[in-house]
Regions:
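Rossmann-fold NAD(P) dinucleotide-binding segment
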Residues: 52-114
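Amphipathic alpha-helical hairpins
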Residues: 16, 54, 61, 67, ...
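Helical "substrate-binding/catalytic lid" subdomain
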Residues: 167-287
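Hydrophobic beta-strand scaffold residues
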Residues: 28, 48, 115-116, 158, ...
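NAD(P)+-binding Rossmann beta1-loop-alpha1 motif at the extreme N-terminus of oxidoreductases
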Residues: 1-64, 88-89, 124, 195
């Protein structure tokens, strides 16, 4: 099974991971709760697994990319019961908190496998060996070397974080924490300028820092909130989930969670107001009242 890999979860990122493996000539097993997504990949050359457990048993390297850690653990429920992961490397590539990374890794190791936790720092359409965006991976050192040929198909910028299974989640959440705070700041700054009749597009030109802040200003200035209508990016609902992860990590680590609690509530209010499918810049609509 040295040239085989399994991909569990075929959302936008999971499907991109599977296609990258297929492009590299790897025998690729796939599983997803929604069968049409499996059928699409099978038509492209993948092999369907009937269950998540079957996918985990089909290859020595297993890439897990689902929406939550709870979903990931549920997908492999039968494997946890029969301890069938001996000789396998399981790489958790969904968004997790450090505590969740440790929990998932403990289950993998108890079932006889080697555990890695990773963070992919790009959108699905950039996945591939020519991608320069970082992919950070930590955990079992021997497992990393086994998984390396498959991980290199995700990005040419593979960062080995050593044996710290929680490092990728911590770094990922650290970057995401700056992002969710900045997007809230953009909305506030835009509303401030609106109230005073100042030019938001000029503010965008003046702003040279932060993750894509100028684009969010322009979206607000042009009321172009439909997702990807002006610039690509994550939906407000996706960023609301990010805020929840950052809040959970602060509480888990016992650090002051006042700011992430506020931000999580702020983002969730925007989702509850019906803006979840719009660009994250739609946060300004909550401030507009």
């Amino acid at each position: 099974m040295g040239n085989a890999v399994s991909v569990i979860g075929l959302g936008a990122m999971g499907a991109a991971l599977a296609r990258a493996q297929l492009s590299a000539g790897h025998r690729t097993f796939v599983w997803n709760r929604s069968k049409p997504k499996v059928e699409t990949l099978v038509a492209e050359g993948a092999v369907a697994a009937q269950t998540g457990a079957a996918a985990a048993k089909a290859a020595d390297v297993v890439l897990v990319c689902v929406d939550t850690n709870t979903t990931a653990e549920a997908a492999l429920e039968d494997v946890w019961r029969d301890g069938a992961l001996a000789g396998r490397v399981v790489v958790q590539l969904g968004t997790t908190t450090p505590a969740e990374a440790r929990s998932f890794a403990a289950k993998v190791r108890a079932a006889g496998g080697k555990a890695l936790d990773g963070a992919i720092m790009c959108y699905p359409d950039r996945v591939g060996p020519e991608n320069s965006a970082p992919v950070m991976v930590g955990g079992d050192v021997e497992g990393f070397e086994v998984a390396r040929p498959f991980l290199k198909q995700i990005s040419g910028n593979l960062i080995d974080l050593g044996d710290n299974i929680a490092a990728a989640a911590a770094l990922d959440l650290g970057l995401l924490a700056t992002s969710i705070s900045l997007y809230a700041g953009v909305a506030h700054a835009a509303r401030l300028c609106e109230a005073e009749g100042a030019d938001i597009t000029l503010l965008a030109k003046l702003c040279q820092h932060g993750p894509r802040a100028p684009e969010r200003f322009e979206i607000i200035a042009k009321d172009a909130f439909a997702l990807n209508s002006l610039y690509d990016g994550g939906s407000l609902a996706v960023w609301a989930d990010v805020a929840e992860h950052v809040k959970d990590q602060a509480q888990s680590a016992g650090i002051n969670s006042g700011l992430p609690e506020f931000l999580s509530d702020f983002y969730r209010r925007a989702v509850d107001a019906g803006h979840g499918t719009e660009d994250v810049a739609a946060l300004v609509k909550i401030l507009r009242g």
